[in-house]
Amino acid sequence: MIKNLPQIVLLNIVGLALFLSWYIPVNHGFWLPIDADIFYFFNQKLVESKAFLWLVALTNNHAFDGCSLLAMGMLMLSFWLKENAPGRRRIVIMGLVMLLTAVVLNQLGQALIPVKRASPTLTFTDINRVSELLSVPTKDASRDSFPGDHGMMLLIFSAFMWRYFGKVTGLIALIIFVVFAFPRVMIGAHWFTDIIVGSMTVILIGLPWVLLTPLSDRLITFFDKSLPGKNKHFQNK
């Protein structure tokens, strides 16, 4: 019997209900006005403020994705530096399991969710596009934006940080998620619901089976025992 089965099932139900609240209604029901209002709010700001235009352009440049990796790496590094050699190895392996989980859930989400939709910049007409207002390389559109894969990866990171390093670290990771995921919404490359519905659906249905069961711990232990190297956490067991 899985110890946290009631919590897992509840989170799965919430995730499914969240998705169906968006998927079943005609034109996505109450979600579409929310999506449209958020898009038009930020889209109008692009021509009202040059500073905002540049902010959105730069935070959607591919180099900014590297900054998100740096932020995640620095947070993990702060714990890695405090550990002894076996503990450092275990943190690295935890990162490997986190990456593996992100890849699997992202692929499952893309394959199983029966949705394909273009970003708001490719849906609405008579709008402002950063790529037309500035000559800066930036991502302001997507032909298939649902679910938001970038937001999903950052949410998985946040959940792993919460699970293995505590609530405060999890909250810091959530700040990283907001800072690096929502510029995609501000520029119009993603709908708000690509993240709040799409990414969250995959997270609520898939991730509890990894983090609220022994699976993640067992994977970490397996890789610790199997991968070459010194300072294995379980080498004397």
For each of these PLM feature ranges, what is it?
Residues 1-71, 110-140, 228-237:
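N-terminal transmembrane-helix/juxtamembrane module of multi-pass inner/ER membrane proteins
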Residues 2, 132-237:
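Membrane-embedded catalytic cores of phosphoryl/pyrophosphoryl-handling enzymes
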Residues 2-6, 80-92, 162, 166-168:
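Membrane-interface helix-loop-helix junctions at transmembrane boundaries of multi-pass membrane enzymes
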Residues 9-10, 89-98, 169-172, 193-197:
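Alpha-helical transmembrane segments of integral membrane proteins
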Residues 17-22, 99-104, 177-188:
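Aromatic-anchored segments of alpha-helical transmembrane domains
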Residues 39, 43, 73-77, 105-114, ...:
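Membrane-water interface at transmembrane helix exits
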Residues 60-80, 150-153:
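Hydrophobic alpha-helical transmembrane segments
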Residues 71-110, 203:
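Interfacial segments of alpha-helical transmembrane regions
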